[in-house]
Design a protein with these regions (language model features):
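Alpha-helical transmembrane cores and adjacent cytosolic helix/loop segments
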Residues: 1-167
Length: 167
């Protein structure tokens, strides 16, 4: 699927040194991340709300924050892909590094918040009800996230993007 998406949407894929190819690859990875994370958010939010599961709803919010990280990366690629101008004679490539820093900070903050929430649940546990629908949504989520991780890492490695590799 990864190779199919790259071949379908990226022209001249072999020339990753070309700024246009590099930018197109980064944009594709970010858009795929946004779409997958928004779909995961919707599925988990609906199931979490239907079954009253705080953990699934919290995971849905986590997917929404992942989508926002992808949006930050997309903006970084867009700004970083701008050509050199009078005020920036060496181009705008540093924006991609700033986007990578922003994504790293977001991941750190989300990790801390989820850690606090998990600790609160350990201290004050609530009963959990089993649901096949919840289980199916969570298994599908794991599979989608594994694929996304491989896809984004492959694109990041292909174009030597610290931002994508950090995502």
């Amino acid at each position: 699927m990864t190779d199919f998406l790259l071949r379908t949407f990226i022209k001249n894929l072999q020339n990753t040194a070309d700024k246009a190819v590099r930018s197109a690859c980064g944009n594709l990875a970010c858009i795929v991340g946004i779409l997958c994370n928004v779909l995961l958010f919707l599925g988990k939010f609906i199931v979490g709300t239907l079954f009253g599961s705080v953990s699934i709803t919290a995971d849905a919010i986590n997917n929404l924050s992942d989508a926002s990280s992808n949006i930050v990366s997309l903006v970084g690629f867009w700004l970083g892909g701008k050509p050199a101008d009078k005020e920036h004679p060496y181009g705008h490539a540093r924006y991609e590094y700033l986007a990578g820093l922003a994504v790293s900070v977001m991941i750190l903050v989300i990790g801390i918040e989820l850690g606090k929430e998990s600790l609160a649940k350990v201290i004050s546990p609530t009963p959990v009800e089993f649901s096949w629908l919840s289980t199916c949504v969570l298994v599908a989520s794991i599979l989608v996230k594994l694929w996304m991780s491989g896809f984004i890492r492959k694109v990041g490695t292909l174009i030597h993007s610290a931002t994508l590799i950090a995502t």
